[in-house]
Structure formats: structure tokens, C-alpha cells
Amino acid sequence: MKLANLATIGAFAVFLAAPVGSLVTMGLDPAAERAITLTELTSAKLLTPNDEKYRNDVARRLVSNSPVGMDAIRAKNALDVKVFGFVNTSQVISGADGWLFYKPGFQNGACMSEHDIGVMLGHVEALRMIAKGIGIDFRMSVSPDKEVVYPEKLGPAAAAATGCKILSSRLWRRIAKTSKSSIIDHFDVMGHDVTDDLLYFRTDTHWNELGKLKAVRQLVFELTGRKVDGPILASGQVMHATDMPNRLLRIDHEEAEETYDDYVSRTFPDDSNQKIADTFILHDSFYGVSYDLLKHVFLNPLFLSYGNENIELEVRNALAKSPKHVLVNTVERNMLSKILHGEMSWTGVLGKAFLDANAKTAGGCKMSDAAKDGLKFENLSKQPSGDFTAGVDPQILVRLAEHGRPCVRISFETAVRQNTYVYLPIKDQVNQNGPYFEGFSLMLTDAPGARDFWLVLPEDFAGMTLRVDPIYSTGTLSHLRIQTGALPSFSPVSNM
């Protein structure tokens, strides 16, 4: 019995030591993700009593990224996929007919609220107006998640895991169409029948070559008005190593993919004089995998990935060149977070860069103090000292110049740490509760002290009334000054 116990203990010790031993003798597996660094292994945080989460994460990756650990993961996933025909990890879940879906894209089944959708869509239009004021055509495009295009391929388990995802997808698209959103939704060209060629890979998170082509044809129409018609015919086939098996499950897998080289060279020739010029494209992986095709459509475009380590500097440099087009793409699962809290928010790299570029252009506007009959103060009381005391929800309504691109400058001092908001007027108030809406607005600094905001808007806003909320409740504004003016129009006034 003692001998058996010793053998059991020895086997268990070998089982525990094998991953670490293989790591020491063989190093990290080449396929390992989030590999352990020397800095992490020597960090004082490993000895911090209250940092158990850090130690657990390092230990888990130390074992799982070892050759033995990786082999165990591969074997387990290969057994699930190829023998049992079903896998369910933190990142991948099986659908019907061998399809795989990316679980983080389901966002834990959370629902998008109508309020958040409205704010999100309004913010995109506000970005578009800030860009238009400085002569830039800003467009945002959305690449639909695979489960949104192919919900019929989810199967029972994946369908249950999606939770509210499909309903939320339908809801935001319905609201976008009702509000006449400028978003280029690639879902609009992803319609299909059961017998149609696939637009996405069965086991990849991305669209395939046919899906890319449909999306790019849509871009051409949206940005130029030129419609690219005709059947898209394949000219060959290649094998494609798909990302979910290879990168996430760590098992080898390839999927057949149709190629369309003849169609591309005929429809989008390299020497075409119809290429879209002067374009800055900020993108994630969907446009990343479409890079070669996009170069057939755009003339020397400037591509920048969200993952670029110098993204803030690169975005500012790109806008400093005053491109004619700025095209920003996001995959649907990241859309809400990128717009409201990420790169496209007013504190994000793109939103802030647009505000700064707009303010720089507005600095060339000839300003004068706004006429008294062009100003209206609400919940703001002027004191004998000249200061203003703000109550709850103070507002300043500013009548903009009647012609050209209206400019406004607002400066004041305050001791409170509350953001300044500028609400853009809504000309078409269909489905709105008034001339201003939370999303169709700019969020500016909340820093105490002197504030000085410059803004130039498109000629669409000439003669309209801008709403400025200097702070949102209770405080003093000193040295308040409001100036207005105008810059020449770029083009005849268009309808909003």
C-alpha cells in the first residue's frame, strides 16, 4: 500500500512539474498567446499579499503556454471539435454544421438600450458635422458580426449564448434607418439565400473574399455615388487557415476559399482613374484582412489600425493633412464602446483630434461679440460684479451667423469640475423631443479654471441657434464672453 501511495504521489508530482519543466527545457510554445515576460516573473507584485489575481494569472499562463500545456490544450480542443463535434470555451462556441462563433462578440448576451443607441447614432452625426465644418467628409462603416449575418447557423447552444445580441442588432439598425443615419452598414449588402455562396468563413471571425467584395462595392457607391453592378464570379480557389481553430483553439485547420482575381482586375484595375483619392482609413481587423482589395479602390490611402502604438500622433498627423475623406470602420461588436467610450468619443483619440482640428480652423474666423438679441440665458443670473451664477441646468442659447460656415467662441472661468456641453441644433426634428438631443452634442473639458472653446460648423447651421451648457449645475462663471462670426462656405447650402 505504501509503495502504491508513493507511486501515486510521484505520478502526481510529475504531472504538476511537467508543464514547468517543459517550459524550462524547451521555452514557450511558438503558438502561445499572452506569453509570460521576464518583467512579470520578477515583478514585486508576485510577493504582494493582496494581489492574488496577478499571481493566479501569471501561474495560469506559465503552465498553459508551456509546450506540455499547449499540447494538452490542443489535444482537448481537437477531441472536442473533430471527435465530439462541439466545443465551448471562453472564446469559441460551436454552431450548426461545423460552424464556429466568437463568444466575446455575444457580449454576454447583454441588450443595447434605445437610449444608448440614440446617443451612439447622434454622436456619429455630431462627429460628421465637426469634420464637415473643416471640409472633411467623415463616414463611419460597420462590419457585421458573423452571427448577425448567419443567425441560422448558430445552433441551439450558440443561439442561447447570444442572449440579446441578435435582437439588439435589429433594434439599432431599425433606429438608424428611421433617423437616416449616415453610417455605412455593410450588413445591407450581406443578404443571402441557402444556396448562395458563403460571405463569411465557417470557422473564422471574418468575411471571406466574396464578403469583402460586396462591402467594397458598397463603399464605392456610398463615397462616390458610382454603382458597381454585375455578377461576382470566382476564378480560383485556395486554402485559408482560419483564425478560431488556429489562433484560439490552437489546432490546425484550413477552409477552402474562392478567389476573384479576374473580377477584381477587371472591375477595379490598378490604373483606374476612378480610385477614391485623399482618404484616411482608421480600421480594425475586418478592413485589415481587406487591405489588398481596398488598395484597388482607394488611391494611396493612409491606413491606420486601432492597435497602432502611436495612434494618437498618427491620427493628428493624418487630420493635419486635411484629407478629403476620413473613413472609420469598426466591427459591430465593438461599435457601441468605440463610439461612446473609445477612440471616437470626445475624449478618445479621434474625437479629440477632430475637436482640436476644428478649433484650429475656427481660429482663422473673424469674430465679434455676439449681439444681445442673439443671446438667451436660462438658469444663469448676472451679478453686479459681471459674474454669472448658475442654477440647475444652466444654458446659453447663441444665434449663429446667417451666412457661411458659422463660428463661435465661448470663454469663461469657473472653479467647478463639470464638463461643458455644446448641443448642435436639429433642423429635422422627426422622432426627437425638441431642437436638441443628448447624442448630437460635444462634450468639452471639465477642468477648473479658464476655458476657451472655438468652433466652426458647416453652412447647414447658418442662422440656427446653438445651445451651450457651460456647467451642468450650480456654480459661478467669471469673465464670460461669447463671440460669433463666419468663414466662407465650401459649397452651396445642402439640406441636413
Name these PLM-found stretches.
Residues F412-T414:
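Hydrophobic beta-strand positions in extracellular immunoglobulin-like domains
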Residues M1-L397, A401-R409, Q418-M496:
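Extracellular glycan-modifying ectodomains
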